[in-house]
Amino acid sequence: DIGITGNLKGQEEIALGETLRKAALSTNQGHEAIMQGVNTLVAQGMGASEAGQYASLLGKTATATNADMNDLAKMMYSLSNSLEIKGEANLKEALNRAAYGAKLGQFELKAMAQSLPTLTSLFAAKGIKGQEALTQIIASLEVGRGASGTDGEAVTNLVNWMSSMNRDNTTKAYEKAGVDYQKSMQNLVAKGYSTRATWPSRTPPAASIG
């Protein structure tokens, strides 16, 4: 129950219930599905009132992409919490980026929604946040999917790569080859490249979640 989980008072719970019903009707989603998405946001740590504001966006995205509502909610929370993409307008832009990237490539948004919570945490830990971080993740997954052949392998390869960044053994390996790893990374970033050192900064156009 959202009212209990989110510590809502009577009138607040009534207002939230009305918001969820309107979101369900306007997005062609069932009331239970919308409630599940908002409940997931609250369970992840978002305030109930704030989570309710995203009910319509969750519904529109689920309808447009056929992604699982629970996965979408976890994805949305990770975008907000890990990458610090805050507010409905910015989250809508982020979801549009993800949908557009999925449409262009082979890595569908349904699979992306399942993997993003882990990947956003890894990128955030490296100080890579915001819409640019999401663009890097999407591009990496799409290229990785084409190279590996499966969604799972693409995610695993990216996780392994991110986990190895800045490790002592990585830095030492570059030093043995006569390369200052940290300085090289800083130079690439200064020239407009991502911390992954392979992806130039690019911003895909918006998609059409609604």
What are the residue ranges of the model-derived segments?
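Alpha-helical scaffold elements adjacent to nucleotide-binding pockets in ATP/GTP-utilizing enzyme cores
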Residues: 75, 94-97, 136, 157
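Cationic, amphipathic, low-complexity alpha-helical segments enriched
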Residues: 195-209
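A short, structural motif
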Residues: 1-74, 81-93, 102-113, 126-131, ...
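Extended amphipathic alpha-helical segments with heptad-repeat/coiled-coil character used for oligomerization
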Residues: 107-115, 125-199
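Amphipathic alpha-helical scaffolding segments
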Residues: 57, 77-78, 159-162
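A short, terminal or domain-edge coil/loop segment
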Residues: 84-88, 122-127, 164-170, 207-210
